[in-house]
Amino acid sequence: MTVLHSVDFFPSGKAPVAIEPRLPQAAFPEHHHDFHEIVIVEHCTGIHVFNGQPYTISGGTVCFVRDHDRHLYEHTDNLCLTNVLWRSPDAFQFLAGLEQLLPQEQDGYYPSHWRVNQSALQQVRQLVGLMERAGDGMDAPAVANREILFMQLLVLLRRSSLMEGATNNDAKLNQLMAWLEDHFAEEVCWEAVAEQFSLSLRTLHRQLKQHTGLTPQRYLNRLRLIKARHLLRHSDHSVTEIAYRCGFGDSNHFSTLFRREFNWSPRDIRQGRDAIIQ
């Protein structure tokens, strides 16, 4: 597995934070690093496999990667990211207690992926721009200024995440997408889902297309197919059983959609024939 080292990314041995734009982010094999990373998805979509679990990411997704996590990107579609790298909680001179603003693992579950609305994403871009222009001076005021900007970023992400329970249409769509991540295998009636999240059906279609470039049904199908591919690689369930487990009522239809999405059949994935290009 590829290991990325801080010496190759941080401007100096003492700098606690670095900015790495990926515009766009190409598919990248599984790797980990000796630093922490906040991945901010600017726009378009891709698959983020985080510690072996696949997530569909799109504009507004924020992922918190720790120094022992492993991850990769695949099936990227002009996916644009900004990576905010930081060494460790004890690398800062003026900041303490950062853990209170970061996702925390509880009972083996780590809530690594958050979503923020487009207004917050614009504020994030502005803050990151200030961080990029803050210079690399090592005198106390310069260091303190950079660390304050990083703290402001964490506060903004925390306040803007789903945990804060915002109620505008943008936030409702984020909540809907998080719901789909957990309920993808269920039969989905879009009229009922729109009503559940207090959105009109037209608004749901328009906003999801703006966020992901996909219609609601296409987004749901992709989510199901990603989960199915994970099961094909990491379980002993039959192709038919996996199709049903992931919300497809017909295994032949599932196989057709799967090949169209990934250019491999479910059986190819089960037999590892795609491994040569991973």
From Swiss-Prot:
The record marks E241, D250 as: Interaction with sigma-70. Its main location: cytoplasm. Residues 174-272 form the HTH araC/xylS-type domain. It holds the Pfam family HTH_18. GO terms for molecular function: DNA-binding transcription factor activity; sequence-specific DNA binding. Signal peptide: none annotated. One of its GO terms (cellular component) is cytoplasm. CDD domains: cupin_RhaR_RhaS-like_N. One of its GO terms (biological process) is rhamnose metabolic process. Residues 191-212, 239-262 bind DNA. Keywords: Activator, Cytoplasm, DNA-binding, Repeat, Rhamnose metabolism, Transcription, Transcription regulation. It is found in: Cytoplasm. NCBIfam families: PRK13503.1. Binds DNA as a dimer. Activates expression of the rhaBAD and rhaT operons. HAMAP family: HTH_type_RhaS. This is HTH-type transcriptional activator RhaS. It comes from Salmonella dublin (strain CT_02021853).
